[in-house]
A protein has these predicted regions:
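Acetyl-CoA-dependent GNAT
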Residues: 2-104, 115-117, 121-127, 161
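C-terminal "cap" of GNAT-fold acetyltransferases
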Residues: 129-145, 149-175
Length: 175
C-alpha cells in the first residue's frame, strides 16, 4: 500500500538514495537538489511539502509540492502583458514541484497511486485556498504526460503559443 510521509531524520537518507533510469535523468532534478530548493524556499517563508513515497515500509519515491498565492507568469517572460497573463494573474494554486519513483520500483502503479495521495493532500488546502494544482514536465516525457492526463491534468490551450522550444510544458488540474 502506497502512503506519503514527510521527509524527516528517519527517511531522508533513503530519499537521497533514490535514482531514476539514465534516460530519465534529464526529466527530474536529483533529490539532494530538490531538498536544497525546499530548504531555500522554506527559508524565504514559502510553503513546501516534501514527502517520501512508501510502499508499505520501503521508500520507493519522492514528491515535493508547494503553494503560490499570486501567479505572476514570471517564469515565462513572453507571457507578460499577454492574454494568458491577464487571465491567470493573481490566481492561487498548488504545484507539484518534483516527483520521481526509483528505477527499481517503476511500472508497478506506484507513481499513479502516489500522485492520487498527493492530490488528496493538496485538496485539503494546507496553505490556503486555491483553484488549481499545476505541474510541468519535459515535452519529450510522454510517460509523464500520459500519467498526468489520466489524473485530470490538461495543458491549457492558451499557453501553447508562448512556449519556447526548450520550455517544460505546464499542465493544470482544477480542484
Amino acid at each position: 500500500m502506497i502512503h506519503l510521509e514527510k521527509v524527516n531524520w528517519d527517511n531522508y537518507e533513503d530519499v537521497l538514495k533514490l535514482k531514476v533510469t539514465k534516460e530519465q535523468e534529464e526529466f527530474v532534478a536529483d533529490n539532494d537538489i530538490s531538498l536544497i530548493h525546499a530548504f531555500l524556499a522554506l527559508s524565504d517563508g514559502e510553503p513546501v511539502y516534501a514527502f517520501a513515497i512508501y510502499s508499505d515500509d520501503k521508500v520507493v519515491g519522492f514528491i515535493q509540492m508547494g503553494y503560490d498565492d499570486d501567479w505572476t507568469g514570471e517564469e515565462h517572460e513572453s507571457w507578460l502583458n499577454s492574454d494568458v497573463y491577464k487571465k491567470w494573474e493573481g490566481k492561487k494554486y498548488y504545484f507539484i514541484w518534483r516527483f520521481m519513483i526509483d528505477k527499481k520500483y517503476q511500472h508497478k502503479g506506484y507513481g499513479k497511486e502516489a500522485l492520487i495521495k498527493a492530490m488528496e493532500f493538496l485538496r485539503t488546502k494546507p496553505s490556503g485556498d486555491a483553484e488549481y494544482i499545476t505541474l510541468s514536465y519535459e515535452r519529450t516525457n510522454e510517460v509523464a504526460k500520459k500519467l498526468y492526463f489520466s489524473l485530470g491534468f490538461y495543458e491549457p490551450e492558451e499557453f501553447a503559443p508562448y512556449y519556447e522550444e526548450d520550455d517544460e510544458i505546464s499542465a493544470i488540474c482544477k480542484f
